[in-house]
């Protein structure tokens, strides 16, 4: 390995160390004292509950851990959006799990909490996975009620989804382990089965204080909406237990008795490890995002090897449209179609030198055709993003780059097979769209620590914004010195760089998680396993395409 490989490896490992540090910080929720208070009430933390619930010999993939990262700081922050969530196995069955974190503002819902819960319900609906709610929440965070309560994608959408999932036959189980108040009280009741822990679990539309204020009635928490009340008087809950462990054990039993569903039938054979060492991924990705590299080196370390020891990647139109690599492969045994941005400089058969990471007419045309082929064959698609955008200039415009780009976007948008997106490096502008960014409904979307997501590259954006700002100042008659201009540029670049980081994207749930590159195989395999649980694949139609 050369010096540059070692440098890249050092930078990536440093990034991963920082990632683990941040994840540990998030795992503390509302802090040590809040956790101790939870334990004093014989209550587990959300991560302890999930650990107790899930099969220990199978992976639990946490999603949305960075939701709310560096947001709501005026309110003390909202680690993980006040909700711990992900996909795990319960009694051998893959499930979506959502657990309120009572240590974070009593489990109150911030705007990002609603967005995260809706994302988890979306995953359950798209993949027909059972969903388990571990409820312990004080309801809407009142200081921000205007941003969480009334709109289409706000708090009320949760209960609409409860009803829709029930109609779709998706199992929903709610274990009420703490408070469940106001509008949130509808969630367990709209689930298939509701379990409560005596002494801690409570469900009511209005708590004792509000009841006193509204109608003058004095009543305690347990009598108003405790486990005994709802299992013996109202009939709202189905089971009551003395401890959380007993309650969660019953959840396991319920899930264990579910009928095994039909699947989509995506092809899978015995898995073989990659043909090249997967940990070498750390040294392949340049520490400088503008530098070229060969995307095949990434793919060969993610996909399975064949029996002959070589990579299972079979390139489609290998010598045409070289700035996008398309091909069929096996990944943990699954048959997949891969669409990946080639980052090295290539030469077309017409003699044109093409920049890596840029989508040209021929590569857009090739990718569109390949995506259509995968839909025809019902093969899941994996997008590996490191894209700076579409080629610009008169040569591309006259050749119809907009037409070819639109054809690729059309194919991605109308694709009916599951799409899984991994943001490896750059993800800029329309390139993000064409390579199945968040707006194009990937079943799952993950980012490496090296990812950058923005409308354009940092230097380009900063210089453009600087020109606008300086022009505005000059229009007002203000003279701008070179030193002032440089200070403005540095400030703009700093702000823009923060907004392009994977942490910013994960905080806003533009990606489901930031992952270690070595985990890429596992998360893609688990994503396809989840997608395979939905047997329904719609008919593939593209509508009007300009050719």
Write out the residue ranges for each language-model feature:
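Ligand-binding clefts of soluble mixed alpha/beta catalytic domains
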Residues: 1-547
């Amino acid at each position: 390995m050369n010096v540059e490989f070692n440098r890249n490896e050092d930078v990536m490992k440093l990034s991963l160390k920082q990632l683990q540090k941040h994840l540990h910080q998030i795992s503390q929720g509302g802090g040590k004292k809040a956790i101790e208070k939870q334990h004093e009430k014989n209550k587990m933390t959300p991560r302890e509950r999930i650990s107790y619930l899930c099969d220990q010999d199978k992976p639990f993939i946490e999603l949305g851990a960075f939701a709310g990262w560096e947001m709501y700081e005026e309110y003390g922050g909202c680690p993980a959006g006040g909700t711990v969530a992900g996909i795990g196995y319960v009694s051998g069955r893959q499930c979506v799990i959502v657990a309120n974190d009572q240590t974070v503002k009593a489990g109150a819902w911030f705007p990002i909490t609603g967005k995260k819960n809706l994302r988890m319900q979306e995953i359950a609906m798209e993949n027909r996975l059972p969903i388990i709610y571990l409820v312990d929440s004080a309801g809407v965070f009142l200081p921000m009620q205007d941003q969480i309560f009334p709109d289409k994608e706000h708090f009320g959408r949760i209960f609409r989804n409860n009803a829709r999932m029930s109609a779709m036959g998706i199992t929903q189980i709610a274990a009420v382990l703490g408070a469940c108040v106001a509008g949130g009280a509808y969630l367990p009741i709209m689930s298939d089965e509701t379990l409560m822990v005596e002494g801690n679990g409570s469900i009511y539309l209005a708590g004792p204080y509000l009841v006193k204020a509204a109608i003058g009635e004095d009543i305690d928490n347990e009598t108003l909406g405790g486990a005994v009340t709802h299992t013996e008087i109202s009939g709202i809950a189905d089971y009551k237990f003395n401890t959380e462990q007993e309650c969660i054990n019953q959840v396991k039993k319920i899930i264990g008795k579910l009928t095994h569903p039909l699947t989509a039938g995506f092809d899978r054979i015995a898995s073989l490890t990659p043909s090249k060492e997967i940990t070498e991924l750390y040294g392949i990705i340049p520490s400088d995002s503008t530098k070229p590299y060969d995307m095949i080196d990434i793919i060969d370390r993610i996909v399975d090897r064949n029996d002959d020891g070589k990579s299972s990647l079979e390139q489609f139109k290998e010598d045409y449209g070289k700035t996008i690599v398309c091909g069929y492969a096996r990944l943990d045994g699954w048959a997949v179609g891969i669409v990946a941005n080639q980052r090295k400089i290539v030469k077309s058969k017409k003699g044109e030198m093409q920049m890596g990471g840029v989508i040209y007419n021929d590569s857009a045309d090739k990718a569109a055709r390949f995506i259509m082929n995968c839909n025809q064959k019902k093969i899941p698609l994996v997008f590996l993003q490191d894209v700076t955008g579409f080629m610009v200039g008169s040569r591309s415009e006259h050749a119809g780059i907009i037409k070819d780009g639109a054809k690729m976007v059309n194919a991605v948008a109308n694709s009916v097979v599951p799409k899984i997106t991994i943001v490896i490096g750059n993800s800029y502008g329309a390139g993000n769209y064409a390579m199945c960014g968040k707006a194009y409904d990937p079943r799952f979307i993950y980012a490496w620590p090296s990812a950058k997501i923005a409308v354009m590259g940092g230097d380009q954006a900063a210089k453009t914004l600087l020109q606008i700002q300086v022009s505005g100042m000059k229009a007002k008659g203000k003279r701008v010195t070179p030193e002032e201009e440089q200070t403005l540029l540095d400030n703009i670049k700093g702000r823009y760089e923060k907004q392009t980081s994977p942490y910013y994207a994960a905080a806003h749930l533009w990606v489901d998680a930031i992952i270690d590159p070595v985990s890429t195989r596992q998360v893609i395999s688990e994503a396809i396993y989840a997608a395979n649980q939905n047997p329904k694949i719609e008919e593939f139609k593209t509508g009007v395409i300009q050719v």
